[in-house]
């Protein structure tokens, strides 16, 4: 994604708020995140001076300073003595932050960011499936079997199917005992679950094929086959995304 600097008029354009937000600092932060990601304020350039931001958003200096502090915490800007507030390179941005990730996905026509997200999820969940196959007790195995059977009944109801889909993956993650891995995956999923770019094509055929993958994962965990469970999870997450994905080009980050 290449940032394209915008005109000074656009950079100082007031946001199209239909009503004045209750939390002004949060609203200003969200707007500035979007502008930075879009390239209105490119990496290496300074944010507009404080008085300009106050005028643009019709807010006080206190609100602007709070918003800039939040942008610093997200890794989008650095305050430099004598140089002002500088926009940082994308490599410094906190991509686990909801606003940053959401804005980046919205601007990324190539879907590369979602490819990276899926690749990250695939690595973590494959490892957790490996551990789950070694640790899963009868209760976990029964739960996974029940979810697979329930999803077989829901292939004509994608919305309900996806709820059980998430429950299946969460059961595997919980069975692994990896709280950090589970937290990262759940955080990533929570931030993209309502994105049409991420959900993509999810009709009956997708649900049927997807649940074949779930059944394979369940069978390998039930057989206490760590390597097989990891491979089944890796293949399932890859195949499911390739089917849902509707962007240009090949998802090269997923090729192995």
What is each residue range found by the language model?
Residues 1-123, 130, 250-254:
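Short linear motifs at protein or domain termini
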């Amino acid at each position: 994604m290449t940032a394209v600097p915008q005109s000074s008029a656009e950079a100082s354009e007031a946001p199209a708020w239909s009503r004045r937000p209750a939390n002004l600092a949060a609203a200003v932060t969200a707007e500035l995140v979007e502008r930075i990601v879009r390239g209105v304020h490119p990496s290496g350039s300074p944010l507009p001076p404080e008085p300009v931001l106050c005028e643009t958003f019709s807010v006080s200096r206190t609100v602007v300073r709070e918003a800039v502090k939040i942008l610093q915490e997200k890794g989008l800007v650095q305050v430099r003595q004598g140089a002002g507030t500088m926009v940082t390179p994308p490599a410094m941005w906190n991509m686990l932050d909801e606003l940053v990730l959401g804005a980046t996905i919205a601007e990324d026509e190539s879907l590369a960011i979602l490819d990276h997200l899926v690749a990250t999820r695939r690595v973590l969940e494959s490892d957790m499936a490996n551990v789950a196959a070694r640790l899963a007790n009868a209760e976990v195995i029964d739960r996974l079997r029940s979810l697979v059977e329930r999803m077989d009944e829901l292939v004509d109801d994608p919305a309900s199917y996806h709820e059980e889909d998430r429950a299946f993956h969460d059961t595997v993650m919980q069975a692994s005992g990896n709280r950090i891995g589970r937290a990262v995956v759940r955080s990533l999923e929570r931030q993209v679950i309502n994105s049409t770019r991420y959900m993509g094509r999810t009709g009956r055929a997708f649900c049927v094929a997807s649940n074949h993958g779930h059944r394979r994962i369940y069978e390998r965990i039930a057989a206490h086959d760590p390597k097989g469970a990891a491979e089944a999870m890796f293949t399932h997450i890859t195949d499911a995304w390739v089917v849902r994905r509707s962007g240009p080009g090949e998802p090269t980050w997923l090729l192995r």
